[in-house]
Design a protein with these regions (language model features):
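C-terminal recognition in membrane/secretory proteostasis and scaffolding
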Residues: 21-45, 54, 61, 71, ...
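Conserved active-site neighborhood of the chymotrypsin/trypsin-like protease fold
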Residues: 72-73, 95-177, 211, 359-361, ...
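A short, Trp-centered hydrophobic/proline-enriched beta-strand micro-motif
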Residues: 58-76, 167
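Gly/Ser-rich catalytic serine loop of serine hydrolases
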Residues: 82-92, 151-156, 172, 198, ...
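A conserved glycine-rich beta-strand in the N-terminal activation segment of trypsin-fold
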Residues: 47-54, 73-96, 102, 121-124, ...
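Active-site loop architecture of trypsin-fold serine endopeptidases
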Residues: 109-111, 147-150, 168-181, 191-215, ...
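Bacterial N-terminal signal peptides
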Residues: 5-16
């Protein structure tokens, strides 16, 4: 295509000149011919293009290209190493000889290298901190002198709507830096797809963000105002991309200041807006467009025993909550959970509420809430499982749902309503019989696949550890009752033991169980102490 374009361009330049020669009458014969030197036209003066200004400076001295080799867990055969994959992202240098990028760029990583502009070498990098709940990470390079000629970038604030921004990175795996420009289109709460459960402040921009841009800085007036992290494909929406804004970035950096990332805290409540006049009148509320109705208080959350269903939440830390659930922060209207988003584990928040038509003020000490973890993706961990008699038992979570795509409505209900219906109070782990490794000792058991374990030999099974411990006990038989109707599954321990090595060798089961990351306690109240 390049050659064709140049050829047409030359034709356009030459075309008018040829036409002019044909229209001009021939010179008189008596007129002497001018010399070649005299007849040569004066050279045209072609203006030299002026290099456009760089509003953000020379970013090449701050940007790096990150190449990651990762191992994705295999939830269908969790004893095996998963598939090896390779990905490319971007990062940028900040103070303290650190490189900021996205968590999804370095998740499940086994080997990381970074490259600098103008340097042919690849440098080994290691992860310092990773925050999967807000899709941010810090890595570093230990090679001497790596950061010597690199310029740490500074952070700015929240940009104005319709203001211009520039996104930097290495889209589609390119080896040279790319820059795209766009405007700020929206400032709102958005789902962070890396975890698939966390919602934080995010800024929508029209600059093109493609694979390889992830982790790169989005800049304005020489300062970082966000980190590019997700967007829609062209089939869904055009020119819709998102960046992690600086309030989220600053919270992450403050959280890790003590050398440990605690993660986001949460009120662990659900609520409904109070915009209907009749509903407001029924609740005895003023016609002032304030307040939201508390509909659920999670027993494992910090509001348990403080808030009740039916309370009306009017203000948070003296920020009035509108009936559409928004508050005003830094001149912007955002969802009221943003007030809590900026707090940390152990911080307190003051709540103005209305209970039984009476005003009250209460205080809540904030903490992380473990039941939500089942509905989010897990990274940098090995899947938990138990294999017994060729039966594979695993705790229910989002990664398991993605791997097996179950159609059983009972499994979907336990997953979807795990928090809202507080299923975790009885089942901190929802143990599913996900697969059967065929062997003579487990024939005719296919109908039990997808079942949720309720009890074994009359003993309630609450966690994966309970299941493993029960199977290790001495018994003539194990009677496994699933949730719902139907006959129990029965296993003969002697037959299971006789087939143990045979099954391990046949299916390359190197390890029969992995119990890591189980809930640390049995009660919801104790579980909240994390």
């Amino acid at each position: 295509m390049k050659r064709a374009i140049v050829f047409v361009w030359l034709l356009l330049l030459c075309g008018p000149h040829l036409d002019a020669q044909q229209d001009t009458p021939p010179p008189f014969p008596t007129q002497p011919k001018p010399s070649a030197a005299a007849s040569a036209p004066a050279p045209a003066i072609v203006p030299v293009p002026v290099t456009p200004p760089r509003p953000n400076g020379k970013i090449q001295n701050s940007l790096v290209r990150i190449t990651v080799t990762e191992e994705e867990p295999d939830y269908k055969a969790p004893w095996n190493a998963g598939a090896i994959q390779r990905g490319v992202g971007a990062g940028f240098v900040i103070d303290g000889s650190r490189i900021m990028t996205n968590a999804h760029v370095v998740s499940n990583s086994r080997y990381i290298t970074v490259e600098r502009e103008g340097d042919p070498n690849k440098y080994r990098a290691t992860v310092l901190f990773v925050a999967h709940d807000c899709d941010l990470a810090l890595i570093t390079v230990s090679a001497p002198g790596f950061f010597k000629n690199m310029t740490p970038l500074k952070f700015g604030g929240i940009p104005e709507l319709e203001s211009t921004v520039s996104a930097y990175g290495y889209p589609i795996g390119g080896e040279r830096m790319s820059v795209t420009a766009g405007i700020v289109s929206r400032i709102d709460f958005q789902l962070y797809t890396h975890s698939s459960i966390d919602q934080h402040l995010a800024i929508q921009i029209s600059a093109q963000i493609n694979p390889g841009n992830s982790g790169g800085p989005v800049m304005q007036n020489g300062k970082v105002i966000g980190v590019a992290f997700q967007g829609y494909s062209g089939d869904v929406a055009q020119g819709v991309a998102y960046m992690v804004p600086t309030p989220v970035i600053r919270r992450f950096l403050k959280d890790i200041a003590d050398g440990h990332y605690n993660g986001y805290v949460d009120l662990a409540i659900t609520y409904s807006k109070l915009q209907n006049p009749a509903q407001r009148k029924f609740l005895g509320l003023k016609d002032d467009d304030r307040g939201v109705l508390i509909t659920t208080v999670v027993a494992a959350g910090p509001c348990a025993g403080v808030l009740r269903e039916g309370d009306v939440l009017l203000a948070m830390d003296d920020h009035p909550i509108a009936s559409d659930s928004n508050v005003e922060l830094e001149g912007e209207r955002v969802e009221f959970p943003e007030v809590v988003e900026r707090k940390f584990k152990g911080d307190k928040v003051k709540l103005n509420i209305r209970r039984d038509k009476q005003p009250m003020t209460v205080t809540v000490q904030l903490n992380a809430v473990w039941p939500y973890l089942i509905q989010g993706h897990r990274y940098d961990v090995r899947p938990r499982y138990v294999v017994y008699g060729g039966l594979l038992f695993q705790p229910l979570n989002l990664d398991l749902i993605d791997a097996y795509q179950p159609t059983d409505l009972r499994i979907r209900h336990f997953f979807d309503y795990f928090v809202v219906e507080q299923i975790y109070l009885e089942h901190p782990d929802v143990i599913v019989l996900t697969n059967i490794l065929p062997d003579p000792i487990n024939t005719y058991l296919t109908a039990y696949r997808g079942g949720i374990v309720d009890e074994i030999n009359g003993k309630k099974i609450h966690t994966l550890e309970d299941l493993a411990k029960t199977f290790s006990e001495t018994s003539d038989r194990f009677v496994v009752k699933m949730i719902g109707e139907g006959p129990p599954l029965v296993l003969d321990p002697k037959q299971v033991e006789a087939a143990r090595e045979r099954i391990k060798m046949r299916y390359n089961v190197m390890k029969e169980q992995n119990l890591e990351e189980q809930p640390a306690a049995k009660t919801a109240q104790d579980q909240n102490k994390i």
